[in-house]
Amino acid sequence: MSAVLSTENGLILKLYIQPKASRDQIVGLHGDELKVAITAPPVDGQANAHLVKFIAKQFRVAKSQVIIEKGELGRHKQIKVINPQQIPPEVTILLE
């Protein structure tokens, strides 16, 4: 499976998370995953909440449309984005 998979109602993203980064950004490919740097620390779910907020903003969807399917407690996550209104350029490249 590639880092980004298109489904009938959205996208599935395989992510590698880098917490406590200097800024929030989609870095690029990291093996077969998409690397995302976030500023939040990996403590008490702060990184997950921050990641959901960041992904929702990037894809212009509500936070409720971003679901962490796998990897709640680790750096390797699988996230589903339901009906994205916009797709960031870093992700568009991987869909082609």
Curated annotation (Swiss-Prot):
<comment type="similarity">
    <text>Belongs to the UPF0235 family.</text>
</comment>
<protein>
    <recommendedName>
        <fullName>UPF0235 protein YPK_0828</fullName>
    </recommendedName>
</protein>
<dbReference type="InterPro" id="IPR003746">
    <property type="entry name" value="DUF167"/>
</dbReference>
<dbReference type="Pfam" id="PF02594">
    <property type="entry name" value="DUF167"/>
</dbReference>
<dbReference type="GO" id="GO:0005737">
    <property type="term" value="C:cytoplasm"/>
</dbReference>
<dbReference type="InterPro" id="IPR036591">
    <property type="entry name" value="YggU-like_sf"/>
</dbReference>
